[in-house]
Amino acid sequence: MASIGRDTQSGIYRGGALGKMPLVPASWDALEAAARATMSADAFAYVAGSAGRERTADANTAAFDAWRIVPRMLRDVGVRDLTVDLFGRSYPSPVIAAPVGVLEVAHPEADLGMARAAAALGIPYVASNQASISLEDTFASTPGAPHWFQLYWSSSDELVESLIARAENAGAEAIVITLDTHMLGWRPRDLDLAYLPFAHGLGIAQYTSDPVFCRLVTERIAAPTQSETPRMNSAVLRTLLDMTRHYPGSFWSNLRSKEPRTAVEVFLEVFSRSSLTWQNLEFVRKRTKLPILLKGIQHPDDAELAVEHGADGIIVSNHGGRQLDRAIGSLDALRAIVEKINSRVPVLFDSGIRSGSDILIALALGASAVLVGRPWVYGLAVGGAAGAEAVLRNLLAELDLNLGLSGNTSITELGAATLSHNAS
């Protein structure tokens, strides 16, 4: 990736001279607008929306505005290096494709498309626990590419154990445990539309492909509860058809089966556990030798507790503002956590990155790498795998150019001296 900046930039301009426009817009606002125009109202609200009045999401992007890059001149920056080392492996850039669920609402290629996009750039793809396609099929579609797996801690420890084992057997190189979704945040955009994709059978492929979950479904059918049978209307019919279409197997067999609806009911019951404590982490630590990263850390003391309880890495994140409204911007939490950890484990960052300059700022503040989510989802919506790859390539190109324009040749040179804090 030594010249990804100039190569990408030149390729776009050469294409323009021949009448070929870019597949995806380079500007964030235009990219979001293009995705909105492509996606259904329900789908766009789910992807773009955040918690409450979306003040945390606003804080995430505003936090970057408090920093300015201080360029240095007359340095030889002809050769630049974006590589980073994480958990014993070298990666060509500091960018990781963050876990995002229910990708089928963005594009039919869903997780397979995103896995191909990440693999084309050597970027680790973190498969979501709420994927539209099983982790086995997703990982098998890009053999040799770096794959990680994100875990939501279910109320069933047996299911948690099964998911971890499946990820390890499928070739995952790390387990990312998301801590901030032990309850679903209050999301007005979704609430106003009365839309939760999981209730329609979307985004539960990791579950319907899991033997433990399938057993729970079978047991539920064999011992039915007193669940209310909804009165049939057009909305109920659409929901039942959604469940049927998205459940594994033949549509016509599923239409006659109780399994699709029961699977949704079981998922909604076992999805998360609000009683988790630090002591629960030992359960996962005993069941895998893979690096374990804890995602959702925002306080230095929690970062310390994460290390004390065996975490191999920390992801400073607030879920892109989707969980708790009026929380601090994730970037505002980064420096104190980096100082607290003092290089004992890698500290990764996400929430609010929209540009290559944002990535550079996060790295200069001490992040070992960054995770990017919404930007590539919008690219996927606009252009499938090629669109997602183009968005990621644009981010890397801007990072590469800005690394050189700031007078640096490698990620390791970035630090406090690279930035100036804008007090206003």
Predicted regions located by residue number:
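Active-site-adjacent helical/loop segments in soluble small-molecule enzymes
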Residues: 407
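Short, conserved beta-strand segments within well-ordered enzyme catalytic domains
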Residues: 68, 83-85, 94-98, 124-126, ...
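Glycine-centered helix-coil hinge/cap
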Residues: 40, 342, 383-384
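Alpha/beta enzyme core
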Residues: 102, 116, 141, 158-349, ...
